């Protein structure tokens, strides 16, 4: 492991973010899928359209139980001779069990990858990637492994231990730091993730998957589709994921409860998905909340008042 090479980067709220960082993503992992039936098998399991996914594209998706509750949220892309599903490590053993449940009937091999995952962030990261790849696509194969675009300021590199020495020798321009900076970019882009504390609790729309092209409403049947479709066409979904800011004494964790104001009282309002705490206590968090709250609703976490921050996208699914 390369963890000692990636120290903590201490940032305050008003600090400018580094324009090029590289981090080892120890809290993330890949499920890989190979075999003759991989496409048809995965198509019948997940919310996104696997069949139409081009070789050089990446998409968000979710894997649900029969009632439409999410086991995982992932980003899917082609890798080596199959597919890779990039997702949170804490929930990956549960997800592996669930995604393999019907695999015995198909020619497909599903496993957790032991590849090294590196996160490239910042405006200059793409410049470096452009210099070391022969493509301008969102998924690129290079001598170091597979690069996949996670957001406008985040790229994932799936690599192997034998490549790290040469790779590190070429990263003198980058700030090497721990993966908290990756989390900060992820939160600023309001990208959902699913840790084990949130497994099997929410439907995809509660984490905004429809807003980031993570649900296909035109594909054929998949597990949980009936609930997901009802949420769209009958309006049964009552939750969404929002971006909040406030002051915290300690880093909030996935699954933490956040309160909301009801008149002069407080009651449980929602659940933290992810959070980043700056050194000065200012904190950004993604939280699942009711989607019909009044504009003047206040929020409370760790005895501090929090407020909504505008999302970088709309919650429509068109």
UniProtKB/Swiss-Prot annotation:
Gene3D superfamilies: 2.40.30.160, 3.30.70.1630, Aminomethyltransferase beta-barrel domains
Keyword Coiled coil: no
Record's subcellular location: Cytoplasm
List of residues binding folate: 28, 182
Keywords for this protein: Cytoplasm, Folate-binding, tRNA processing
One Pfam family matching this protein: YgfZ_barrel
InterPro entries linked: GcvT/YgfZ_C, tRNA-modifying_YgfZ, YgfZ/GcvT, YgfZ/GcvT_CS, YgfZ_barrel
Source superkingdom: Bacteria
GO MF annotations, alphabetized: folic acid binding
tRNA processing found in the keyword field: yes
Gene Ontology biological-process annotations: iron-sulfur cluster assembly; RNA modification; tRNA processing
GO cellular component: cytoplasm
Main localization, broad class: cytoplasm
Protein family (similarity comment): Belongs to the tRNA-modifying YgfZ family.
Function: Folate-binding protein involved in regulating the level of ATP-DnaA and in the modification of some tRNAs. It is probably a key factor in regulatory networks that act via tRNA modification, such as initiation of chromosomal replication.
The protein, known as: tRNA-modifying protein YgfZ
């Amino acid at each position: 492991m390369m963890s000692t090479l990636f120290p903590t980067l201490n940032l305050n709220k008003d600090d400018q973010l580094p324009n090029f960082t590289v981090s080892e993503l120890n809290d993330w992992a890949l499920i890989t899928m190979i075999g003759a039936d991989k496409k048809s098998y995965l198509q019948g399991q997940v919310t996104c359209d696997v069949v139409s996914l081009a070789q050089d594209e990446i998409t968000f998706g979710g894997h649900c139980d029969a009632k439409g509750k999410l086991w995982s949220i992932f980003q899917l892309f082609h890798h080596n001779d199959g597919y890779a599903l990039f997702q949170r490590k804490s929930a990956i053993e549960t997800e592996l069990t669930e995604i393999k449940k019907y695999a015995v009937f198909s020619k497909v091999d599903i496993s957790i990858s032991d590849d090294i995952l590196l996160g490239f962030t910042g405006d200059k990261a793409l410049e470096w990637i452009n210099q070391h790849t022969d493509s301008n696509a969102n998924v690129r194969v290079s001598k170091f492994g597979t690069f996949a675009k996670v957001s406008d300021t985040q790229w994932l590199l799936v690599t192997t231990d034998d490549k790290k020495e040469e790779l590190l020798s070429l990263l003198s321009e980058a700030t090497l730091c721990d993966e908290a900076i990756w989390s900060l970019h992820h939160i600023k882009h309001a990208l959902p993730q699913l840790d084990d504390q949130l497994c099997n609790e929410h439907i995809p729309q509660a984490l905004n998957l429809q807003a980031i092209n993570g649900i296909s409403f035109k594909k054929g049947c998949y597990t949980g589709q009936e609930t997901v479709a009802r949420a769209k066409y009958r309006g049964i979904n009552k939750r969404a994921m929002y971006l909040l800011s406030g002051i915290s004494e300690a880093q909030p964790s996935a699954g933490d409860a956040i309160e909301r104001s009801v008149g002069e009282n407080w009651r449980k309002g929602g659940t933290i998905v992810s959070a980043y705490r700056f050194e000065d206590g200012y904190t950004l968090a993604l939280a699942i909340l009711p989607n019909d709250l009044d504009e003047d609703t206040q929020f409370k976490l760790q005895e501090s008042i929090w407020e909504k921050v505008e999302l970088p996208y709309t919650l429509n699914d068109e």
